[in-house]
Amino acid sequence: IKGLIVVALFFGVWMLLSQIDFVKHFRVEEAKSGTEKSLGDIIWNEIEDTETIIFDDSIVNTLDSLLLPICKENGIERDSLKVHIIDKDEVNAFAMPDNHLVVYTGLIKACKNEQALLGVLGHEIAHIEGNHVMKKLSKEIGLSVLLSITTGSNGAVLSEILKTLSSSAYDRSLETEADMQSVKYLLNANIDPRPFADFLYELSLDNELHKYTYWVSTHPESEARAKTILN
């Protein structure tokens, strides 16, 4: 009887699996991946043409050495992250399609210590790892519009995408998720997350730096987020 039950279960599972069009599923996933890569390339090419990119080895290598422990202790392939440093006073960093991570020199200068900087970068890496970037763009721009830009140039749409990525917030739930994931990244790498919370709190205050602080305006309720991290 047991043998018959096992056979029946096997064929039941087999019948269910046979109803799934795996070829179609993988083709859809492959198409999504191709779209994301194309978008990432197009957006980055636009940034390269309009911004000043930092290639100084002393700066690039220092940032890379800071990121290595975060990646190593959290199972993230360092080479999968395409990190770019832009010479700009704005205190900002943002994630882009296809694992691009843009960091402004204004953010690096504003952070009083490495832990604070890594907290911010961990937050953006969490957006990348959680596929939040494409979710955000699909919701705010529209998947059909995103697909159209990969098949032909559209300056207005491209500008809107860049604005969405660099100057608008994610859903509150995704922001909280990214904060908490960043804290996990830090703790797994034996890095104190409290300076990250301190950084959020300081930037939430009304001071001269505030006018350059895009990261706070696109990540609202920084004081409340700081308290959540500390708790």
Q: Which sequence ranges carry the predicted segments?
A:
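A Zn2+-metalloprotease active-site environment signal
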Residues: I1-N231
